[in-house]
């Protein structure tokens, strides 16, 4: 779930 990390980082 690397996508979530990028989403949070924006």
Curated annotation (Swiss-Prot):
Enzyme Commission number(s) of this protein: 1.6.5.4
Keyword Flavoprotein in record: yes
Activity versus pH, per record: Optimum pH is 8.0-9.0.
Residues binding FAD: 5-10
Family that this chain belongs to: Belongs to the FAD-dependent oxidoreductase family.
Catalytic activity field: 2 monodehydro-L-ascorbate radical + NADH + H(+) = 2 L-ascorbate + NAD(+)
Protein's job: Catalyzes the conversion of monodehydroascorbate to ascorbate, oxidizing NADH in the process.
Keywords linked to the UniProt accession: FAD, Flavoprotein, NAD, Oxidoreductase, Redox-active center
Cofactor(s) the record lists: FAD
A GO molecular-function annotation: monodehydroascorbate reductase (NADH) activity
Entry protein name: Monodehydroascorbate reductase II
